[in-house]
Structures are given as structure tokens and as C-alpha cells.
From Swiss-Prot:
Keyword Transferase: no
Compartments, record wording: Endoplasmic reticulum membrane
Extracellular side: 118-121
Cytoplasmic-side segments: 1-21, 64-94, 143-153
Role played: Plays an essential role in the homeostatic regulation of sphingolipid de novo biosynthesis by modulating the activity of the serine palmitoyltransferase (SPT) in response to ceramide levels. When complexed to SPT, the binding of ceramides to its N-terminus stabilizes a conformation that block SPT substrate entry, hence preventing SPT catalytic activity. Through this mechanism, maintains ceramide levels at sufficient concentrations for the production of complex sphingolipids, but which prevents the accumulation of ceramides to levels that trigger apoptosis.
Reported modifications of this chain: When hydroxylated at Pro-137, ubiquitinated via 'Lys-48'-linkage, leading to proteasomal degradation. In endothelial cells, ORMDL3 proteasomal degradation is controlled by the sphingosine 1-phosphate receptor signaling pathway.
Protein name: ORM1-like protein 3
GO BP of this protein: ceramide metabolic process; intracellular sphingolipid homeostasis; regulation of ceramide biosynthetic process; sphingolipid biosynthetic process
PANTHER family: ORMDL PROTEINS
Domain-level remarks: Ceramides bind to ORMDL3 N-terminus and stabilize it in a conformation that physically restricts the accessibility of the substrates to their binding sites in the serine palmitoyltransferase (SPT) complex, hence inhibiting SPT catalytic activity. In the absence of ceramides, the N-terminus is flexible and permits substrate binding, thus liberating SPT from inhibition.
One term under GO cellular component: endoplasmic reticulum membrane
Subunit-structure text: Ceramide-sensitive subunit of the serine palmitoyltransferase (SPT) complex, which is also composed of SPTLC1, SPTLC2/3 and SPTSSA/B.
Residues annotated with Hydroxyproline modification: P137
Amino acid sequence: MNVGTAHSEVNPNTRVMNSRGIWLSYVLGIGLLHIILLSIPFVSVPVVWTLTNLIHNMCMYIFLHTVKGTPFETPDQGKARLLTHWEQMDYGVQFTASRKFLTITPIILYFLTSFYTKYDRVHFVINTISLLTVLIPKLPQFHGVRLFGINKY
């Protein structure tokens, strides 16, 4: 029995990306990060684009693929305790609208970054590695998989 809870979901983490306005807020947050980085003096535009991409992908990796459990006390017998937020989203159903949005966003940001860095080799390699570290854990084949025992418990 959960006393004092106002939500009707067993695990509120499952539906948070389907909330009204969350996609717009997400894109505006990326834009705000980019504007803040652009306001730093003596930093070139290609470096700002690469930093925007790296910071976005690092935050996405940490919040979606590293942090496990839920901040709420859920009546699911601890099932969510061992799942990352990505694995909890939409009750684990693959290829939902939210999952597609969160998969396509780093790809679009990668294309923009590659264009504005003029496909410079160093920036291209850094951004490609960053993109792959975010996209590979999103694949359905990696649902619940812990490579080398990292983040197992």
C-alpha cells in the first residue's frame, strides 16, 4: 500500500517520456545548452557543436543507461530495481514513439555537428564514438544485457 501517492502507474518511470510537452522541453534544453556554450568567449563554433553533442550524449548515457531503479517506492516487488531507465520506459516495449524520439535525437544532433564542424577528422571521430556509445545500448538486442558485468548490480 502506497500512502500519499497521487499517480496511478505502478512505476511512473515507464510513462514520463510520454508526458505533455516533454519532447519540446527536451529539444529546447539542447538548444539552451548550445546557446550557453556559444556565449563562452574564445571558443570556436566547431568546438561548441562538438561540446554540445558530447555533453548531450554523456547526460543521455548516464540518465538512461547507467542509473537504475526508480526514485519512487513502487509496489512492483523490486522489479524496477535492476532495470535502467531505458529498460523501464514504456514497460519495456520496443519501438514506441518515445524510444524512437530518443534514438533519432542524437542522430540528428550528430548530423548537425558533423555539418557545422565541416567534417573535420578529429571532431568526426570524437562525435562518432560518442554517438555509438549512446546508440548501441538502445538496440533491442541489448535489453537487460550488462557487458563485462558493468552495472550488473
